[in-house]
UniProtKB/Swiss-Prot annotation:
Domain notes for this protein: The DPH-type metal-binding (MB) domain can bind either zinc or iron ions.
Main location (coarse class): cytoplasm
Pfam families, per database record: DnaJ (PF00226), Zn_ribbon_CSL (PF05207)
Function: Required for the first step of diphthamide biosynthesis, the transfer of 3-amino-3-carboxypropyl from S-adenosyl-L-methionine to a histidine residue. Diphthamide is a post-translational modification of histidine which occurs in elongation factor 2.
Pathway where it operates: Protein modification; peptidyl-diphthamide biosynthesis
Organism for this UniProt entry: Candida glabrata (strain ATCC 2001 / BCRC 20586 / JCM 3761 / NBRC 0622 / NRRL Y-65 / CBS 138) (Yeast)
GO cellular component: cytoplasm; nucleus
Compartmental location: Cytoplasm; Nucleus
Protein name: Diphthamide biosynthesis protein 4
Record lineage: Eukaryota, Fungi, Dikarya, Ascomycota, Saccharomycotina
Family label: Belongs to the DPH4 family.
Domain called DPH-type MB: residue spans: 97-169
Domain J intervals: 10-82
Gene Ontology biological process terms, A to Z: protein histidyl modification to diphthamide
Positions that bind Zn(2+): C119, C122, C157, C160
Amino acid sequence: MTVKSKSRISHYEVLGVPVDASTDEIKLTYRKMLLTLHPDKSKTVPIDSTIKIRSGVSINQIQEAYRVLSNDQLRAAYNRALNDSNKLAGFNNFGDGLDEFNLDEFEFNEEKLEYVMTCPRCQSGGGFVLSEDMLEECIEDGLTESEEQGYQVLTQCTACSLWLKVNFFINDEEE
């Protein structure tokens, strides 16, 4: 499923509901929006002040948003596509604005002793490169360590402005 929108707003924004809204909340909001916009009904039904309709949103957009978000399978596919689209644009759902990856998601180059990953935004093949030496330096410089969480390093793509948090653990087999 591709996420297409002429106005570049999500179905959630069209309906004015949060991403975690229940199907019942979506249904109620949809009905209130239609009543508010309907030329015959809007005069006889009291206006609900909780309903905020974005400027420029059409009835067709509202109907399409409801069709997708009220169906569990379509909604799950839409959420995946929306998430993928946001990642390519450099956005994510974390409050700090950074995507999180585990070092296990990187490919290890044994010759260079480097972990390499393609950038999820610009698709640069060597977008993220972390050497073992760099990771060891980060540990020595006092990165936060926790038995459960391990270590974390921030790194920027070599080809674009995307920053990632990379989580990793130390393997103590050498001791």
